[in-house]
Amino acid sequence: MTASIVRLDGPVAWEECGPAPDRILQGQPAHRAWNAFSDASGQFFCGRWTSSPGKWRVRYTENELCVITAGRVTIESVAGQRESFAAGDAFVVPAGFEGTWTVHEECVKFYAIFEPRQVRSA
């Protein structure tokens, strides 16, 4: 069987996806996502995500490539590093990152995530 190209810019079947209420710091952000592709290992997936304005805590166990296509966001680490992004910007959030996401205006992004399996020790 031959693998097929997967378009990320077509019609979207959005699913509600958080954030968890105990992580929200400001506003009432509503997230929706559409996973367009997942690999057979379940470690890599990509698609589109959207959020209404708000601020919430994050703790990444995965590596995520983000490409903002609409809106403005600010991401701040617990160490105080602050980066702002708008439509057309691309960035990576590495596994182990802890901090906050703030969405200033309705945001849409493409994402590609790699989340390695946990290795069990013998």
Language-model segments: which ranges?
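A short, N-terminal "cap"/entry segment at the start of jelly-roll beta-barrel domains
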Residues: 1-43
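Conserved short histidine dyad/triad with adjacent acidic residue
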Residues: 42-60, 94-95
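Short, conserved beta-strand element in jelly-roll/cupin
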Residues: 51, 60-75
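Structural motif
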Residues: 55, 64-65, 72, 98, ...
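Short hydrophobic/aromatic-rich beta-strand segments that constitute the beta-sheet cores
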Residues: 58, 75, 109-111
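A generic structural motif
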Residues: 76-78, 102
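Short acidic-glycine-tyrosine-enriched beta hairpin
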Residues: 79-95
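Ligand-binding loop in jelly-roll beta-barrel domains
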Residues: 87, 95-119
